[in-house]
Amino acid sequence: MVKSILASVLFAATALAASRMTAPSGAIVVAKSGGDYDTISAAVDALSTTSTETQTIFIEEGSYDEQVYIPALSGKLIVYGQTEDTTTYTSNLVNITHAIALADVDNDDETATLRNYAEGSAIYNLNIANTCGQACHQALAVSAYASEQGYYACQFTGYQDTLLAETGYQVYAGTYIEGAVDFIFGQHARAWFHECDIRVLEGPSSASITANGRSSESDDSYYVIHKSTVAAADGNDVSSGTYYLGRPWSQYARVCFQKTSMTDVINHLGWTEWSTSTPNTENVTFVEYGNTGTGAEGPRANFSSELTEPITISWLLGSDWEDWVDTSYIN
């Protein structure tokens, strides 16, 4: 009986950790050779903006140096990166890189390596980087500008402003997010970060992970980081207490870290003001629940608080969240 149960568990684990090495039927294939297109942008340009059917792009192994803009579509979009294990970003085989700084364009969004305006889009197993680095200041890897967007087992890397979670309901699951300054930021999105690995870089003497820009009580914006990890990126020597969980870009900022493991890179205060001249702390919602590790130890800033129970994904995203979220990535 024990052997039978063990065999069933191992079978289930194997099934969950499936590879995705071939394109599904009907997908537009991007490949260095032999595909429908040799750039991701060309594949996106081939999408119908009027069809209400689900469209799929499959990207084969390789490094693609380009800025990708996905416009608003009438139907759902699925983008798959080739991978040996769909459950983890560590097996991703597709890298999308570009280097644009804010100084070169009109706004933050235009610096992003991936600019996604497609509502109802699901992005799987892509490594997306803005390689501009510290000297460029604001330089995004991903700009998420629509609702019902899901990012699964992806990897986002940058320095400042890595991820702009800007509009609508969004999910980031099993995803690696790396940066140094305000690298999860935005104004209006309700975003659920599920089992993400958040990694900080050496360089700044003091910096924050999140910068939520909710500017009024009526705005829906809320970032919830759930069952995730916070630590220094591999190869980075980050001093104890260098980082804060967040600072308020606007005066009604809302961020929650819950059931998340934190190393000592997090300052004991947990949260910090926007600046000494503009603290923006009077109306913030900076909360935690059940965090662990040295970085979870206080005393915390007096404008933050501890919840008595965790926020649920259904409260944040609505009772119909399972209609658009890939629940196989949500435990």
Curated annotation (Swiss-Prot):
General function of this protein: Involved in maceration and soft-rotting of plant tissue.
Site positions for Transition state stabilizer: Q160
InterPro entries: Pectin_lyas_fold, Pectin_lyase_fold/virulence, Pectinesterase_Asp_AS, Pectinesterase_cat, Pectinesterase_Tyr_AS
Annotated GO MF terms: pectinesterase activity
Species of origin: Aspergillus niger
Gene Ontology CC entries for this record: extracellular region
UniProt name for this protein: Pectinesterase
Active site per database record: D161, D182
Pathway: Glycan metabolism; pectin degradation; 2-dehydro-3-deoxy-D-gluconate from pectin: step 1/5
Subcellular location, principal: secreted
Broad enzyme group: hydrolase
Positions annotated to bind substrate: Q138, R247, W249
Keyword Nucleus set for record: no
Cell location: Secreted
Gene3D superfamilies: Single-stranded right-handed beta-helix, Pectin lyase-like
Family: Belongs to the pectinesterase family.
Underlying gene: pme1
This enzyme's EC code(s): 3.1.1.11
GO biological process assignments: cell wall modification; pectin catabolic process
Keyword Cell wall biogenesis/degradation: yes
Catalysed reaction equations from the record: [(1->4)-alpha-D-galacturonosyl methyl ester](n) + n H2O = [(1->4)-alpha-D-galacturonosyl](n) + n methanol + n H(+)
Keywords: Aspartyl esterase, Cell wall biogenesis/degradation, Hydrolase, Secreted, Signal
N-terminal signal peptide: 1-17
